[in-house]
């Protein structure tokens, strides 16, 4: 047994090794001739057999008082191709039969030279040329002529017998019957489409009705649909199966020895090519019989006007015309294929069959398959359009009474409109296909590296890019500002992210000014009305010494429209810059609350700026709790409650405001430019302007302008509604003289808006006189909610003088805010209680026997000191619906029984 099994294994291994070492046999000119002859012989033999079956059956039924007409006109194209094109005499006989004439008697032998295979395979001047000029009426009359159709069948059978005998003689003379690979190509050259002949017959019961124009068109549709169905169901499966195996072999997925008949691969590929060429010629000839008799009707203006799309219809008709004129025009236009065929098979390298395989698959077979698919799709679309035109009766009635000029005009209009529609539709299809392909690539790339994509989208992944300051006109600045805000609104960071990023920002280089953008997320729950902020002066970036010496400022986004701002969230881009003065970075805990900008109002005193006093702001307080959670609603509410409590105990107002920051300005700038953000820069020594009360906004909305150089602080006391002008102790060293307005007019304009009973102090008027002759400075204004009387804290930085006691009074109570009375912790998770109760239940079940009484159990536990069980009995757990509790309850029930 072991010897037999070893022998069988060795035989199998030897067979497998021999199969893997199979090489394709070489092909010569005799092989080409044999394949063409064999294909023609099989086709003729099959056609003769089918006609021999069809004719007796039709004659038998006709004798039973049934008028059955064989449609031989549609059978003749099935013999097109290299079958009857071996010689000019045979071609002439074939054409005479198509015309309904008696073929000439000629019994001479038809010879074909070995190199002439391309001529009788690719010749296109041999099929149904007389049909090109026929009329529909004459064609229909001959088609339904029963006697003439039977006569054509007899002539065709006689011609088939002559050609079969000719091929048999050629096989004998050329000694081609010894070819051993005939069975290897039979599956590819088998004419399965000839079975259509058995269906090409029509039964006529009422001659007038069955031969009408509508019935004739319906018959043509049935013929072409039956023809296409036969091709799709019986011809294409075998060819496409072998084509797929060839593609797998070309790509390396399939070895040569796994192909069918691997040693005859070149012969099979040549047979495949001859088969495809024959099918394409057959297809074109069948299309001729259907199109040429209806050409006049299909090209009529009335037919075109009732179609679905005039431009698409014209394209289809043009392609059908070319296909009928020469079914192989697409192959002949390929110069590479024609050059290969002209030299084939003498150009085949005997030592390199693999290159021949690749060329055959890529250049010849794939090209034929593509042309075949395009042609079948073209005919299917044409038949659908033809049916639509014939059944569109409503459109036919509308254009029935139109003359030729009106039809031409309507056609031109339809052609222009339909062309645009068709081209747009094709562009959309192309874009959709591109999007699908791009989506697949993006999906694969994103799934392979999702972390990389998240790092790109995350605002904390790295430092933000520095923002370049520019001096633009107000219009251009505001437009660019809105664009930048809309572009950055989707990727803004939260206040927590900004506070965490402060530790990263401390790594900036010393000395030089490196501004960094921080993308902030707008609080979508707060929607403030429109806030009018005056335009700031342009920022100078020429002097590096002034930039390094001055504190750094922050600017906010541009102003939105009043109607739009009441409905949408204000998107703001905050620019924060860091600098180290005295080797100490800016503290992250002293950042101003970003949500304060929603209730901020600022006015910059400039002779050329169009200043507008603020409109009423919302009553919602925007005080900050701490820098780490400045945007938290809970902490903000706690801070508001704390300050309300403090203000109730200490009614004395404290002059508090948000943190001012300063930025340099260009003294020589003639036109003030709106900054890229909503917040205005302040002066070097921290001059601020607090907003006026609610009642002053309308009165002060005129062209009121204030001039200051940064040495004066204009404060509004909320207690008695006074405007106070206070001189600050330090003057800016960089100020230059510029054109100014008298301050008295500005102060008077401000005073006009104050309520009755408010008056300016002499000290403030004295300080106002000193404003003349001083240069303008850029002011940073941040307003608090002055309607409720709540103060805000003014924060100073390095290089800014400290606040006086009057400006910053000491608080009466210690601590930033009081601690809450009760700490509300979240509820205990349900899983914890379930686990605890489950332990108690299991203890009750398994520690003691449940068959005893509860009293005995409790006494026993009391003696043993079982505290856990006693607690469990005193406080029975709540029954839960879970898998574990169900299991315990079932076990307990079984034990208690």
Swiss-Prot record:
* Bias (Low complexity): 444-459, 473-490, 537-554, 657-677
- MF term (GO), any: protein phosphatase 1 binding
Quote a single Gene Ontology cellular component term: cytoplasm
Q: Quote the biased-composition stretches of kind Basic and acidic residues, using this chain's numbering.
A: 495-508
**InterPro entries given in the database record:** GIP4
Q: Where is the composition biased (Polar residues)?
A: 678-687, 698-718, 746-764
List localization entries.
Answer: Cytoplasm
Task: Name the UniProt key words of this record, in alphabetical order.
Answer: Cytoplasm
Q: Provide the residue span(s) of the region labelled Disordered.
A: 444-523, 537-562, 607-632, 647-794
Q: Which cysteines share a disulfide bond?
A: none
- Per its database record, what is this protein's job? GLC7 phosphatase-regulatory protein involved in GLC7 subcellular redistribution and chromosome segregation.
What family is reported? Belongs to the GIP4 family.
Binding partners and assembly? Interacts with GLC7.
Specify the protein name: GLC7-interacting protein 4
Species of origin reads Candida glabrata (strain ATCC 2001 / BCRC 20586 / JCM 3761 / NBRC 0622 / NRRL Y-65 / CBS 138)
Lineage, broadest ranks: Eukaryota, Fungi, Dikarya, Ascomycota, Saccharomycotina
Q: Which gene encodes it?
A: GIP4
């Amino acid at each position: 047994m072991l010897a037999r099994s070893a022998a069988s294994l060795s035989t199998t291994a030897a067979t497998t090794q021999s199969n893997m070492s199979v090489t394709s046999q070489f092909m010569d000119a005799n092989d080409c001739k044999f394949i063409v002859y064999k294909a023609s012989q099989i086709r003729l033999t099959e056609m003769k057999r089918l006609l021999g079956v069809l004719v007796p059956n039709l004659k038998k039924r006709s004798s039973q008082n049934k008028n059955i007409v064989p449609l031989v006109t549609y059978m003749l194209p099935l013999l097109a191709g290299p079958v009857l094109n071996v010689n000019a005499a045979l071609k002439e006989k074939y054409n005479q039969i198509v015309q309904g004439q008696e073929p000439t008697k000629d019994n001479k032998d038809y010879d074909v030279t070995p190199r002439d295979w391309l001529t009788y395979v690719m010749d296109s001047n041999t099929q149904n040329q007389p049909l090109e000029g026929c009329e529909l009426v004459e064609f229909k009359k001959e088609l339904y002529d029963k006697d003439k159709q039977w006569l054509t069948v007899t002539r065709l059978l006689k011609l088939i017998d002559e050609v079969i005998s000719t091929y048999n003689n050629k096989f004998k003379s050329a000694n081609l019957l010894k070819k051993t690979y005939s069975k290897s190509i039979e599956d590819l050259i088998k004419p399965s489409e000839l079975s259509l002949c058995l269906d090409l017959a029509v039964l006529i019961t009422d001659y007038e009705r069955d031969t009408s124009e509508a019935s004739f068109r319906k018959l043509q549709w049935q013929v072409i649909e039956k023809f296409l169905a036969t091709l799709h169901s019986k011809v294409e499966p075998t060819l496409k199966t072998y084509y797929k195996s060839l593609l797998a072999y070309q790509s390396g997925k399939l070895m040569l020895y796994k192909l069918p008949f691997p040693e005859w691969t070149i012969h099979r590929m040549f047979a495949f090519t001859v088969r495809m060429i024959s099918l394409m010629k057959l297809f074109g000839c069948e299309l001729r019989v259907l199109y040429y008799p209806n050409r006049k009707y299909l090209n009529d203006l009335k037919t075109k006007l009732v179609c679905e799309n005039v431009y698409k219809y014209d394209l289809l008709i043009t392609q059908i015309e070319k296909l009928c004129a020469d079914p192989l025009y697409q192959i002949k236009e390929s110069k590479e294929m024609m050059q290969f065929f002209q030299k084939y098979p003498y150009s085949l390298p005997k030592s390199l069959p693999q290159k021949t395989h690749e060329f055959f698959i890529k250049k010849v077979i794939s090209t034929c398959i593509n042309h075949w698919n395009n042609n079948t799709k073209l005919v299917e679309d044409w038949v659908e359009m033809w049916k639509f035109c014939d059944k569109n009766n409503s459109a036919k009635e509308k254009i029935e009474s139109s003359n030729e000029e009106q039809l031409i005009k309507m056609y031109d209009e339809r052609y222009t409109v339909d062309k645009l529609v068709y081209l747009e539709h094709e562009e959309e299809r192309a874009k959709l296909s591109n999007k699908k392909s791009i989506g697949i690539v993006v999906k694969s790339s994103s799934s392979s590296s999702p972390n990389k994509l998240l790092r790109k989208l995350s605002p904390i992944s790295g430092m933000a890019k520095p923002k370049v300051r520019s001096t633009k006109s107000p219009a251009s600045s505001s437009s660019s500002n809105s664009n930048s805000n809309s572009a950055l609104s989707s990727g803004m960071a939260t206040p927590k992210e900004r506070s965490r990023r402060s530790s990263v920002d401390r790594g900036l280089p010393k000395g030089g000014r490196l501004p960094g953008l921080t993308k902030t997320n707008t609080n979508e729950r707060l929607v403030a009305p429109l806030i009018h902020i005056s335009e700031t002066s342009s920022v100078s970036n020429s002097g590096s010494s002034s930039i390094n010496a001055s504190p750094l400022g922050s600017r906010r986004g541009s102003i939105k429209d009043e109607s739009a701002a009441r409905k949408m969230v204000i998107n703001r881009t905050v620019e924060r810059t860091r600098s180290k003065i005295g080797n100490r970075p800016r503290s992250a805990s002293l950042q101003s609350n970003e949500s304060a900008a929603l209730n901020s109002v600022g006015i910059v005193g400039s002779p050329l700026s169009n200043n507008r006093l603020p409109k009423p702001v919302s009553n919602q307080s925007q005080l900050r709790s701490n820098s780490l959670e400045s945007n938290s609603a809970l902490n903000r509410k706690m801070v508001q409650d704390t300050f309300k409590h403090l203000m109730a105990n200490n009614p004395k107002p404290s002059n508090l405001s948000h943190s001012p920051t300063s930025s340099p300005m260009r003294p020589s700038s003639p036109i003030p430019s709106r900054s890229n953000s909503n917040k205005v820069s302040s002066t070097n020594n921290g001059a601020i302007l607090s907003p006026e009360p609610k009642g002053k906004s309308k009165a002060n909305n005129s062209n009121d302008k204030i001039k200051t150089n940064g040495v004066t602080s204009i404060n509004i006391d909320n207690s008695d509604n006074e405007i106070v002008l206070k001189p600050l102790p330090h003057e800016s060293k960089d100020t230059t003289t510029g054109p100014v307005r008298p301050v008295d007019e500005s102060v008077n304009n401000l005073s006009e808006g104050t309520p009755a009973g408010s008056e300016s102090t002499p000290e403030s008027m004295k300080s106002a006189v000193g404003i003349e002759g001083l240069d303008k400075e850029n002011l940073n204004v941040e307003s608090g909610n002055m309607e409720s009387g709540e103060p805000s804290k003014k924060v100073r930085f390095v290089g800014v003088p400290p606040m006086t006691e009057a400006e910053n009074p000491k608080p009466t109570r210690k601590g930033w805010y009081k601690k809450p009375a009760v700490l509300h912790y979240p509820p205990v998770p349900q899983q914890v209680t379930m686990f605890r109760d489950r332990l108690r239940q299991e203890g009750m079940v398994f520690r003691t026997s449940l068959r005893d009484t509860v009293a005995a159990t409790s006494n026993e536990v009391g003696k043993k000191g079982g505290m856990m069980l006693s607690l469990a009995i005193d406080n029975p757990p709540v029954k839960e619906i879970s898998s574990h509790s169900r299991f315990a309850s079932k076990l307990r029930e079984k034990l208690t029984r």
